Amino acid sequence: MGKKVLVVDDEKLIVKGIRFSLEQDDMEVDCAYDGEEGLRMAKEKAYDIILLDLMLPKMDGLEVCQQVREFSDVPIVMLTAKGDDMDKIMGLEYGADDYITKPF
């Protein structure tokens, strides 16, 4: 297997599409469907990149990003429907490395 990717998004159809696409490129993909689960998985396993939704149940993506930054410098890409410049700035200030708006 190739790179290890953690996808954290509560929209199961989007997760399925991302997982399929990444696995076609020989990447190992783990998925979490809420912020708490995503944070737990990020603590338990070393990933090469985290794809993180902004609006998540239990803990939002900004909080997850901020907490991951306390123990890891893994690249984090925010994937979200919120495309305002202010949302992008907030994501980057909380530690994200890049920001992609849905749909992509």
Where on the chain are the PLM-derived regions?
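N-terminal/domain-start alpha-helical segments
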Residues: 1-104
